[in-house]
Amino acid sequence: MTESWNGSSWTELNNLNTAGAYVAGGGTQTSALCSQGGDRPAQNESWDGTSWSEISEQNTYRDQSGGSADSNVSGLIYAGEAPPVTTITEAWNGTTWTEVADMGTARSLGSGATGGQSGGASSALGVGGQIAPGARTGLTEEWVAADIQVKTLTTS
């Protein structure tokens, strides 16, 4: 289900082409990405403000990943269950997925946040997650494309 928030209420929009679970991604009301785990292969879709379109799969299948995107042509999908939990990070450029600098700590079920006004595939935060069955973490990592490095912000 896709819904849009206008500041006071939600409006239902067009649904994803393929229903799934563990959706990661981000974007705006007019341009977004999502990656769904739970099924093989992962289903990736691009939002143009009106409808979802299927796009290519990541290079490495992962379930329960984190994600960050500022549009449907700039995003990251990171970590997740390969299985086991993994550090793999891939960037979307609007056409293809490319493996980039991986996270420092393998995890699944983490949340993602786009960093700054031009986030997506240039900066992101990976927050929390599960590092082993039943073992959760509050670890936050920052991904910055200019440095091609991962920085540990906090540990738990």
Where do the PLM segments sit?
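Polar, enzyme-active/binding microenvironments
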Residues: M1-S156
